[in-house]
């Protein structure tokens, strides 16, 4: 690995033709630090806050170890003050017309442009990243983000008239982050009328500079507040009264801890976890271009994480040879040197990479590193790991920066199996000169972003996110706007925390079933079975639950489902999901309309059932009619789910795909037993999901009646309905590791447990927090909110050019 040369002789320059140093002066960054006497505090409500009796943390140059400044670490009262300032600012900021907010963001973009040299110099100095990446990439993109979201704020009054801002946003950023990560989240939040409190590590002062620039605009100083502190303060910020949403980007385990901490506290949680990306190199690819893609992905200071590299066997030897030769030409050095490719990230990043490499070698992997770096050096040579057995722990672990872990594959099917076999689903690139093969891989990858013959392209108009353990939050494009909006009229999110809940015992066992009185029929009513795998069957518990009518008499029995039945339903759903997701929107629409027609024919039976359970005749008739209409509505909407082209600043289209979540579990509310069941089932099926439902506990018979029409129409296993103790079934679904998403409409305790238990595989959850929902109202029963929760977005980049 070539290192930066210091004052070479003229003869050496003409002999070696190596790059010379191109140092960028950091005088402006030091001057800014000097204006604060090298002691930084927090920026709250447009002012610098330097409270007494706070522990200072050093801000150091990661290359030299020089102490650049000290930053006071926040305590709980500092965070409370920042949240209070954001709450006060929200009252005025959210009431502004979108055009006024857009003008404010435009002014901020001009201020950022005015001070861009200070921004890129300070960012490179304190992070160690190559200055050319910050100067030519991050800072211009930050300006584009402000300008794009200024335009979106102008259009909010028309396009998003039925939505309102969430409120105060708590933003938690990890230690290895760039200020651009903050801008991706701050810009849409401010554009939509929210205010922000950001908790950032004390070693990275660039967010404080951004907050200062925003505060210098004068008006609305409290819309962006930045406090510095350790990661342990994240739960403190997340738990503050008044914080309506928490956006967190960081490590997977930290995300799990935060998910459990926030359970029942009312705040929404958006997670963007992990930094690893994926690159697929096929035998039809331009190998040299793909090698440069690897460099861009992990060794050019654009990415914060490592790379998982899959190479087709027929080009394995050639690709590895060219990659190793390219590694020898990578220049690492001081980030402020404009001629370096890769800077240093500090001792923590170096030690993490060294630990991973050592562990991979101990598990049978082969490691190639270009150049020798002393153990005391802050730099870590680019590392290429290969030959790991598939069962090795490192083969499944997240790859850290700047490590590339290479594995071979034979066929496209095997490549997809290897790529989708990890719990992470962030971003990936596919390198192939055959468009059909590239699209097959791009559509098949379970990730949030796919680039074809490119890597790391970004544009404010294109959504970026992930799936699985990479989190389910989005930034950029229209999806990023909805992260900070909620349907108009939604009340403020208040804590519904149940202090006495025991997570270990909640729903652990079903309630005992005892004789409950005489039956209303002339003969014992036959019990309904569970609807699993396309047919009715007996439960694993071999017991039934009595269902009482409005007079308190037993009208029928339903099966008492348990963990075994949930397991069977989820397995059946996984078998049916691929085929249903591959169906065309027209085919899915036709089946939804057919189910609506079947319910129309069954209208007298369904109305009679509702009346027996206490519904007035007019209400029962209305509920059935609305249920039929909901199926027809989603049958119409499903045909509008095709791919949409996204306009970017680059040549070539970007496809915005809406893909199914996979297996979606739904716990239905007790109220509106037919309408709520259909209103939740229809959008889930329309977006290509396989569904496991727990119907109304008070009146599950309506859902089972609908299943009689589902059986002949839909593939076996696509829809399963399991009856029984709701808390017990909820526990089984929430803890199931093969359920990709869970909607829960029940008690506050159940909502809290679902949020807590979802941390296991970080499934996306949607809970009602114990509050009823007006299913008979179009906005709540068939609104866009259901569509947003029923599918995930994938951005597929198709850039053009050589």
Curated annotation (Swiss-Prot):
GO molecular function, one term: oxidoreductase activity, acting on the aldehyde or oxo group of donors, NAD or NADP as acceptor
Pfam families: Aldedh
Signal peptide: none
Coiled-coil portions: none
Record's subunit section: Interacts with SPG21.
Family as reported in the entry's similarity comment: Belongs to the aldehyde dehydrogenase family.
Name used for this protein in its record: Aldehyde dehydrogenase family 16 member A1
Gene label: Aldh16a1
């Amino acid at each position: 690995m070539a290192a930066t040369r210091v004052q070479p002789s003229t003869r050496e320059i003409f002999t070696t033709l190596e790059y010379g140093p191109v140092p960028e002066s950091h005088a402006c960054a030091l001057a800014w630090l000097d204006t604060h006497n090298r002691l930084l505090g927090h920026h709250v409500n447009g002012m610098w806050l330097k409270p007494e009796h706070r522990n200072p943390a050093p801000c150091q140059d990661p290359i030299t170890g020089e102490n650049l400044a000290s930053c006071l670490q926040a305590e709980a009262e500092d965070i409370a003050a920042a949240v209070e300032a954001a709450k006060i600012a929200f009252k005025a900021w959210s009431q502004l017309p979108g055009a006024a907010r857009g003008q404010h963001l435009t002014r901020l973009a001009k201020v950022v442009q005015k001070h861009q040299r200070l921004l890129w110099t300070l960012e490179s100095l304190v992070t160690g990243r190559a200055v050319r990446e910050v100067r030519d990439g991050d800072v211009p993109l930050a300006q584009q983000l402000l300008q794009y979201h200024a335009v979106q704020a102008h259009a909010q009054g028309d396009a998003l008239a039925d939505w309102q801002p969430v409120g105060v946003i708590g933003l938690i950023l990890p230690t290895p982050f760039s200020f651009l990560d903050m801008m991706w989240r701050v810009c849409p939040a401010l554009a939509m009328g929210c205010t922000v409190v950001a908790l950032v590590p004390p070693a990275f002062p660039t967010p404080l500079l951004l907050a200062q620039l925003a505060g210098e605009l004068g008006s609305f100083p409290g819309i962006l507040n930045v406090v510095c502190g350790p990661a342990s303060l994240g739960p403190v910020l997340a738990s503050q009264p008044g914080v309506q949403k928490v956006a967190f980007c960081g490590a997977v385990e930290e995300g799990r801890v935060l998910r459990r901490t926030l359970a029942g506290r009312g705040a929404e949680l958006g997670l963007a976890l992990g930094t690893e990306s994926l690159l697929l190199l096929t035998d039809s690819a331009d190998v040299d271009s793909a090698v440069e893609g690897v460099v861009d992905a992990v060794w050019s200071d654009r990415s914060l994480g490592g790379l998982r590299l899959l190479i087709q066997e027929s080009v394995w030897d050639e690709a590895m040879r060219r990659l190793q030769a390219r590694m020898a030409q990578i220049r690492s050095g001081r980030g402020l040197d404009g001629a370096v490719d890769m800077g240093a990230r500090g001792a923590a990043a170096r030690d993490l990479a060294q630990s991973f490499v050592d562990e991979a070698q101990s598990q049978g992997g082969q490691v190639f590193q270009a150049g020798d770096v002393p153990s005391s050096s802050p730099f870590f040579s680019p590392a290429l790991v290969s030959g790991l057995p598939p069962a090795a722990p490192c083969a499944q672990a997240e790859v850290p920066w700047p490590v590339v872990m290479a594995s071979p594959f034979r066929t496209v099917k095997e490549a997809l199996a290897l790529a989708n076999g990890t719990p992470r689903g962030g971003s990936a690139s596919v390198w192939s000169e055959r468009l059909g093969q590239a699209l097959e891989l791009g559509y098949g990858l379970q990730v949030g972003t796919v680039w074809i013959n490119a890597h790391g392209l970004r544009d404010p108009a294109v959504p970026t996110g992930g799936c699985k353990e990479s989190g389910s939050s989005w930034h950029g494009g229209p999806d990023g706007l909805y992260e900070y909006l909620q349907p108009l009229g939604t009340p403020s999110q208040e804590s519904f925390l149940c202090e006495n809940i025991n997570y270990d015992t909640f729903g652990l066992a079903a309630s005992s079933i005892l004789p409950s009185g005489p039956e209303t029929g002339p003969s014992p009513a036959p019990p309904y079975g569970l609807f699993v795998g396309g047919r009715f069957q007996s439960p694993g518990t071999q017991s039934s639950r009595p269902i009482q009518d409005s007079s308190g008499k037993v009208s029928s029995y339903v099966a008492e489902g348990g963990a075994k039945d949930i397991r069977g339903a989820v397995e059946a759903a996984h078998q049916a999901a691929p085929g249903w997701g591959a169906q065309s929107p027209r085919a899915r629409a036709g089946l939804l309309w057919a189910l609506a027609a079947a319910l129309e024919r069954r209208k007298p039976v369904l109305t009679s059932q509702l009346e027996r359970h206490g519904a007035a005749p007019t209400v029962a008739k209305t509920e059935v009619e609305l249920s039929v209409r909901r199926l027809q509505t989603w049958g119409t909407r499903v045909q509008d789910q095709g791919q949409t082209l996204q306009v970017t600043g680059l040549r070539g289209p970007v496809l915005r795909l809406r893909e199914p979540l996979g297996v979606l579990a739904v716990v239905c509310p007790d109220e509106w037993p037919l309408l709520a069941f259909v209103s939740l089932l229809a959008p889930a099926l329309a977006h290509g999901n396989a569904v496991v439902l727990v119907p109304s506990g008070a009146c599950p018979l309506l859902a089972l009646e609908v299943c009689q029409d589902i059986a002949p129409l839909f593939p076996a296993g696509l829809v399963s309905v399991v009856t029984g103790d709701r808390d017990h079934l909820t526990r089984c679904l929430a803890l199931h590791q093969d359920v990709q998403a869970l909607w829960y409409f029940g008690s506050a305790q159940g909502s809290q447990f679902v949020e807590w238990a979802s941390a296991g595989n970080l499934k996306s959850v949607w809970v009602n927090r114990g509050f009823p929902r007006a299913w008979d109202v179009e906005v709540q029963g068939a609104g866009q909110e259901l569509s947003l929760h029923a599918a995930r977005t994938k951005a597929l980049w198709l850039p053009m050019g050589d």
